[in-house]
Curated annotation (Swiss-Prot):
Catalytic activity: an N-acyl-L-alpha-aminoacyl-tRNA + H2O = an N-acyl-L-amino acid + a tRNA + H(+)
Major localization listed first in the record, in broad terms: cytoplasm
Gene Ontology cellular component terms for the protein in this record: cytoplasm
UniProt site positions, description: Discriminates between blocked and unblocked aminoacyl-tRNA: 13
GO process terms (BP): protein quality control for misfolded or incompletely synthesized proteins; rescue of stalled ribosome
Cited Gene3D superfamilies: Peptidyl-tRNA hydrolase
UniProt: tRNA binding residues: 18, 69, 71, 117
Organism in which the protein naturally occurs: Rhodococcus jostii (strain RHA1)
Protein name: Peptidyl-tRNA hydrolase
Annotated gene: pth
Family affiliation: Belongs to the PTH family.
Enzyme Commission number(s) of this protein: 3.1.1.29
HAMAP family assigned to the protein according to its UniProt record, in alphabetical order: Pept_tRNA_hydro_bact
């Protein structure tokens, strides 16, 4: 990626009742990145997000968590992109991914949203799907459980034992893509 400002967005739902749910893994990874940046999230009134402003290896970086529910997060992401003049190619969205086994991390640019309404909202608000994604696997729901219910449930006790490591590795993946770009990061991770 270039030296232009990077916008890194962790997706999740606001409120303590969602804090430990699968859908909030993007917020969890953003928390790890915030600690690494040495910053604390604060409200950015013009966008409807909480942000940390800092530098990653000298590059201006905005770390964000939209304060709206995930399905409406596009407004905050587009607002931040406009306010900080960030091109969609310099946006990295961290989100939960049903189609990957728990703990699997994949990087991707553009493409479909795979039924993820948070991504759909962002694509619509930005007017493009051409932004980077850090996909954090949460696995498929068991049996016939509705995926919409599954993503709003807490991680299992077995998953919770590995969750901190998954969030650390996901943060590593975000930092890698910021450092070396998508293709080189994919070659190292995949």
């Amino acid at each position: 990626m270039s030296e232009d400002t990077a916008l890194v967005v962790g997706l999740g739902n606001p409120g303590p009742q969602y804090e430990k749910t699968r859908h909030n893994v993007g917020f969890m990874v953003a928390g790890v990145l915030s600690a690494r940046m040495g910053g604390k999230f604060s409200a950015h009134k013009k966008s409807g997000a909480e942000i940390v402003q800092g530098r990653f290896e000298g590059r201006p970086t905005i770390l964000a968590k939209p304060r709206s529910f995930m399905n409406l997060s596009g407004s905050a992401v587009a607002g931040l992109a406009r306010f900080f003049s960030v091109d969609p190619g310099n946006i990295v969205v961290i989100h939960d991914e049903l189609d990957l086994d728990f703990g699997t991390i994949r990087l991707k640019q553009g493409g479909g949203e795979g039924g993820h309404n948070g991504l759909r909202s962002i694509s619509s608000a930005l007017g493009t799907k051409d932004y980077l994604r850090t996909r954090v696997g949460i696995g498929r729901p068991p049996g016939r459980m509705d995926p919409a219910s599954y993503v709003l449930k807490p991680f299992s006790s077995v998953e919770r034992k590995e969750l901190d490591l998954v969030c650390e590795e996901s943060a590593d993946a975000v930092e890698l893509v910021l450092r070396v770009g998508l293709e080189a990061a994919q070659n190292r991770l995949h």
